[in-house]
From Swiss-Prot:
Function: Binds to conventional NLS motifs and mediates nuclear protein import across the nuclear envelope. Acts as a cellular receptor for the nuclear import of the virD2 protein of Agrobacterium and is essential for Agrobacterium-mediated root transformation.
Main location (coarse class): nucleus
ARM repeat copies, ranges: 112-152, 155-194, 197-237, 239-278, 281-320, 323-363, 366-405, 409-448
GO MF entries: nuclear import signal receptor activity
GO biological process, one term: symbiont intracellular protein transport in host
Keyword Transferase carried by entry: no
Pfam family, one: IBB
Name of the protein: Importin subunit alpha-4
Quaternary assembly: Forms a complex with importin subunit beta-1. Interacts with A.tumefaciens VirD2 and VirE2.
Amino acid sequence: MSLRPSTRAELRKKIYKTGVDADEARRRREDNLVEIRKNKREDSLLKKRREGMMLQQQLPLGAGLDGPQTAAAVEKRLEGIPMMVQGVYSDDPQAQLEATTQFRKLLSIERSPPIDEVIKAGVIPRFVEFLGRHDHPQLQFEAAWALTNVASGTSDHTRVVIEQGAVPIFVKLLTSASDDVREQAVWALGNVAGDSPNCRNLVLNYGALEPLLAQLNENSKLSMLRNATWTLSNFCRGKPPTPFEQVKPALPILRQLIYLNDEEVLTDACWALSYLSDGPNDKIQAVIEAGVCPRLVELLGHQSPTVLIPALRTVGNIVTGDDSQTQFIIESGVLPHLYNLLTQNHKKSIKKEACWTISNITAGNKLQIEAVVGAGIILPLVHLLQNAEFDIKKEAAWAISNATSGGSHEQIQYLVTQGCIKPLCDLLICPDPRIVTVCLEGLENILKVGEADKEMGLNSGVNLYAQIIEESDGLDKVENLQSHDNNEIYEKAVKILERYWAEEEEEQILQDGGNDNSQQAFNFGNNPAAPVGGFKFA
C-alpha cells in the first residue's frame, strides 16, 4: 500500500571538496540514484496491498471475492452495470447495499479492475453520498471500499474521488463507531495521500492526522495497525516534503510502533521515520529526541530486508546531521551493525546504503573516524572499494576519501596499511567525474602525509605513498587526467603532479641532457645513465 514516489529530486546537497569542513563533507542522499530504487520498492508494495491483501489477507466483515474472476465472468458483470446503477440510485436500502457491494466486487478483481467503466456509470457521487449514511454502517463500509479502490488507480481516478468531496467525509469517518468503517476510511485516505504531494497536503489540511493517530493504540486489531501505519507513512512521504510541524506529532506514535514485532508495521513505520529524518538538522534532532535511535539501530540486525532497508535509510539520514547527532548514533551502537552489513551476504542496495552511511560518519571528527577504525570497518570497506559493483565502489570511495580529509596523520597511515591506495587509483578511470574528483582528493590527502613523513626524514627521504601510487599505476592515470574534459579534475591532476612529481621530472630532464621542452622530453644523445624503457622514480 505504498505509493509511487515523487520525481527524482536534487543532487547531493553537500559536494565534498578538499579542505572543506565536516558539514560540507557530509552528503545528503543523492536522490537521482536512490529514487529509482524507491520507485520499484514502492510500486511493488502498492500492488501488493491493492491486489494481494484483497485476495488473501483478512478483510473487515470477512468480505472477500466470490471465487476466481475469469474474463468471461468480468464481462458478464460489466453487462450488468445498468441494472447495478438502478440499484444504487433506488430508494430501497437493501437494493442500494446489494448494488454497491456488486460494484465493490467488480472494483476488487485482481487484474485491471474496470475503474473507468464504473466512473462512467456515474455512481461515484452516490457512493460519496452513502458515506454519510450513519444509520447504515454496512452501506457506508461497502461504499468506502469501492471508493478506496477507485482512488487506488491512476491520478485521474483519484481526482474523481477528491472532486466528489469524499476526503473530508473520510476524515470524519475516522471517528465512526464502526471499526470496519474506520479502517476502510484509513485505507481510502492512504490511497488519496499516496497519489501526490498535493493530494497528501489536501488530506492533511482537512485535519486527518490527529484522528488517524488515534487509531494506533493498544486496542487496535492488527489489520488496523497495518493500514493506519501505512497511511501515516504516506502522510510523511513525498517531495516536496510535508511541512514538518504538520507531521511532527506522529513521532511519539512511531516510536511505539517500531517496538512492535509485525513486519508490515515495522516496515511502514521505519519508512515514515526515514521521510521525517530526510532534511535539515532540526528535523534530525526532532527524530533523535523522539527516542527512536536505539531501536532503529537494533533493527539493522532484522532478518527481513523490507525492515532493514528503511531502518538503515533513517540511520543514514541522521548521520548527515552535525557531529553531535552523528555521535548519538555511534553511541547507540551502530558501528558493529554496519560492519555486519558490509561483511555478510546482503544484497547490493543494502551494502551501498551501508557504505553511504559510513561515508557520513567518516565525514565527522577524528574521534568518529577512530570509532570507525576501531570497529574494524576499514578493511571490508577497502575490499568493497576494490571488488564490488560500481555503485557500491562509489559510496566506499566517498567513505575512504572523507576519512583522509578529516583523519589524523596516524589514521591516514592506517588507511594505507589496509590497502586503500590501489582501489582509489583504479577508480581514476571511472566515467563519473564526481568520483574521479573524490578519489583524487583522497590520494592528495594521502600524499600530504607521505610528504610529511619524508620531510621528517622517514622512509629514506622518499614519499613512500607516492611510490605506492606509482606501483599501483596511479601516476599514469593522474597524468592522463591532465587531458580530462572536467576543468576541476584537470587542475587537481596538474596540482598533484607539480607538488609530488615535479622534482623527479626535473631530474629526468637534467639526466636527459637538459632539454626542458616538456613535449619533447626525450634523450637524443648518448646518455649511458638512461636505462631502457625510461626512468622509474621511486
